[in-house]
Amino acid sequence: MSQPSYFDAMGYEAMIAEYGRPETFVNEIARMPPDKLQKLQNERFLKVMAFAWKIPFYQRHWGAANLTPDDIRSIEDISKLPPYSKENLMASVEAYPPIGDFHGLDTYADNDRPPLVFQTTSGTTGRPQPLLYGPKSREIQNLLLARFYAMQGIRRDDVLHSVYGHGMVNGGHYVREAVLHWTGAQLLTAGTGIETRSANQVSLMKDFGATAIIGFGDYITYLAGVARKEGLE
């Protein structure tokens, strides 16, 4: 038996039926009556908890707090769950190199294991933390970001200029996926000033009619200064 492809494992039709497209969230889900929304949140929370209890990291972390699955019966019990830190995750990586034991891969049979998207944190505070995404969790992340963009008014006829980087960090990659997979807008993946020179970024925005820019505020402010130097307002 061959392993499932990314798109098969993602389950696009089922995902759309369950979560809706970004415009569905803005027009329907965000306006859902509180009791109906709480019921939906509770169902999804319990589903996530059932999966998490199969993962050694959470078994160990919650077990240390004397919790059992029977202690968490609804989303109202979420305050019983002890928080965990990056230090906890990196301790897992140290004990179970190279990716730790918090990812849930061992819950799948070899032939059913989905493809993975692998990223890391930036490592600015130490060793980079591995970030692993299965197809469905990856696309749900992308969809959540696309909802955020939709709520800010991004539509299919927009041209977005992104200055998020595209190294091992997740930033620019999931921004690109969110925009292309879920908004229908045109994306200029310029990246950082190292990837595309700042003067070239300004030219790209002018030539292709960028209607919005996404990224870190300090660099966007810097690009505004570059644009003025280039005679663009």
Predicted regions and their residues:
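Nucleotide 5′-phosphate-binding alpha/beta core
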Residues: M1-T120, R127-I140, M151, D207
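Conserved S/T- and glycine-rich ATP-binding loop of Class I adenylate-forming
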Residues: A52, T121-T124, L160, I213
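Small/polar loops that bind or transfer phosphate-bearing groups
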Residues: Y133, V163-Y164, G215
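Conserved AMP-binding loop of ANL adenylate-forming enzymes
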Residues: A146-W182
